[in-house]
Design a protein with these regions (language model features):
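Sec-dependent N-terminal signal peptides
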Residues: 4-12
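Extended beta-strand/loop cores of jelly-roll/beta-sandwich
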Residues: 5, 16-155, 239, 259-279
């Protein structure tokens, strides 16, 4: 009997194992750790090339439709030297193209191979140029492009500054609030600014008030009360009109009517220009 009990006890573990009652812990398979490969570094993209300033000039020309307007200071305008803008008179101008920006240092450098400006910046207006310097620049530019770029006449300049056929009669070019449209002595810290950073006028032209004075192509002569068609006077004393005011000028300098004459040989760090294009 004792031997039978011992035999039964010895058989129990074997039976339990066979039936799965007794389970042995099986080690879980470990997950194989994968090492992430570092992402391949993308090659740095080259900086975009600056647009060719000569090609950009043509795309920046704005067509100014012809029309008739009153040129000169209105009767209620009263500022220093206003007598040079009297008498107001009727003028008719034909359509022409005018650059929406003042001529930049980048364009001058491209054409002339040098930069005469005192305050540097590729997208700033070129300055420290005389009327004679500008004529040499234009000759070289036209030889390079085969086009007929030129300075606007004084009548063309004022017609465009006033907004042409879209004019709303503003005192300054594009607004009666000078700070919206002009860089002048109260907001510049005596430095010109990149072109096109203020609000444009009704035609999409920038900086027609302020930033740098702009030479015109015709001669500076006293006004008369006579109506005129495309006036282009000869220089009475050799001077040429300057328009628009500058970063060192007062508010009245930036009025659309304000004008003065300058010698063709004289340059200054607030004298610049913008280009017109004949049709």
């Amino acid at each position: 009997m004792r031997n039978l009990i011992i035999a039964l006890l010895m058989a129990l573990p074997l039976s339990a194992t066979a039936q799965g009652i007794i389970r042995h812990d099986t080690p879980k398979p470990q997950r194989q750790q994968t090492t992430k490969k570092p992402a391949a570094k993308q090659a740095a993209k080259p900086a975009p090339k600056a647009a060719d300033p000569i090609k950009k000039l043509y795309s920046d020309m704005v067509y100014v439709e012809g029309g008739t307007f009153t040129m000169g200071a209105k009767a209620d305008e009263n500022y220093w030297d206003v007598e040079h803008a009297w008498p107001a008179h009727q003028v008719t101008v034909s359509g022409f193209y005018l650059c929406k920006y003042e001529t930049t240092q980048a364009l001058w450098q491209k054409v002339m191979g040098r930069n005469p400006s005192l305050y540097r910046g590729a997208n700033h207006p070129v300055e420290s140029v005389s009327w004679n310097d500008i004529q040499e620049f234009i000759r070289k530019l036209n030889a390079l492009t085969g086009k007929h770029y030129r300075l606007p006449t004084e009548a063309e300049w004022e017609w465009a500054a006033r907004g042409g056929n879209r004019s709303r009669g503003y005192r300054y070019s594009g607004s009666n609030n000078i700070d919206e449209v002009a860089w002048y002595k109260k907001n510049t810290q005596d430095r010109h600014k990149p072109v096109g950073t203020k609000r444009p006028n009704e035609l999409g032209l920038y900086d027609m008030s302020g930033n740098v004075y702009e030479f015109c192509g015709d001669g500076y002569a006293p006004y008369t009360a006579d109506a005129q068609n495309n006036p282009c006077p000869a220089a009475a004393d050799g001077d040429h009109p300057m328009r628009g005011g500058s970063f060192v000028g007062d508010e009245f300098d930036c009025r659309c009517s304000c004008r003065f004459g300058q010698s063709p040989t004289y340059s200054h760090n607030h004298f610049g220009f913008r280009l017109a294009l004949s049709q």
